[in-house]
A protein has these predicted regions:
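Short strand-loop junctions, especially beta-strand C-caps/beta-turns
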Residues: 36-38, 145-147, 176
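Structured core elements
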Residues: 99, 143, 172-174
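The substrate-binding groove and active-site-proximal loops of carbohydrate-active enzymes
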Residues: 101-102, 140-153
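Acidic, contiguous N-terminal accessory segments
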Residues: 1-135, 140
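Aromatic- and acidic-residue-enriched carbohydrate-binding clefts of CAZyme catalytic domains
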Residues: 178-191
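Extracytoplasmic/secreted cell-surface and envelope-processing proteins
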Residues: 42-43, 152, 180-183
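Catalytic domains of carbohydrate-active enzymes, especially glycoside hydrolases
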Residues: 155-178
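Conserved strand-to-helix beginnings and helix N-cap segments that scaffold or border functional pockets
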Residues: 44-47, 153-157
Length: 191
């Protein structure tokens, strides 16, 4: 009997490449995010954000360490430049642990967003396999018109988290349609 490989996880935007393996990985509710020691300075912020997001999304308690990853750990590391991955691409491998590697810290961050989506959609059971993923478009964003309706700062912060979750990299806030005639002679080119 042949066991089928896992299908491509459904995330937004869709993964560019997926090579499924057999089985799933269930991460523990308490675990470690392990940073490659040579990349600690570059990836500490990403690891901290991931700890917060795992707590908020899954209710999990993760701690950040450095060193080599063990079974069920989440490992973050920078990799050599890769022309196809570019500045925002990453490789996410799921076997007996989760490994996210990318040429840049931004790529590792986007890899953590994919991991969060997979955990959310697959109810904490991750399909084993490897993805190489990179954005199709350099600018991925959203515009919010706050000139016509008031939005709280907390709402705007929440929107930034949503954008991050879906790997968008631009947030345009339309503040005002009014010029300032007393300062710029009512000239839009000067405003």
């Amino acid at each position: 009997i042949t066991i089928a490989q896992t299908p491509c996880p459904q995330v937004i935007p869709a993964l560019r490449e997926w090579k499924g393996a057999k089985g799933t990985l269930s991460l523990p509710v308490q675990g470690n995010i392990v940073i490659n020691p040579v990349d600690e300075a570059a990836l500490a912020s990403t690891a901290s954000i991931l700890v917060e997001d795992l707590k908020e999304l899954m209710g999990w308690e993760y701690t950040i360490t450095t060193g080599k990853a063990k079974k069920n750990d989440i490992y973050l590391s920078l990799a050599k430049p890769d022309e196809q991955l570019g500045k925002e691409g990453y490789v996410l491998a799921i076997n007996n642990k989760v490994s996210i590697e990318a040429p840049t810290a931004q790529g590792v961050f986007w890899g953590t967003r994919t991991l969060l989506q997979m955990l959310h959609r697959q109810e904490a059971k991750l399909a084993k396999g490897t993805t190489r993923d990179w954005p199709e478009f350099p600018n991925r964003g959203y515009m919010l018109d706050v000139a016509r309706k008031f939005f709280t700062l907390d709402y705007l912060k929440e929107q930034i988290k949503v954008l991050s979750f879906y790997k968008m990299n631009e947030f345009q806030i339309h503040l005002n349609d009014n010029g300032f005639p007393q300062f710029f002679d009512n000239d839009w080119n000067k405003t």
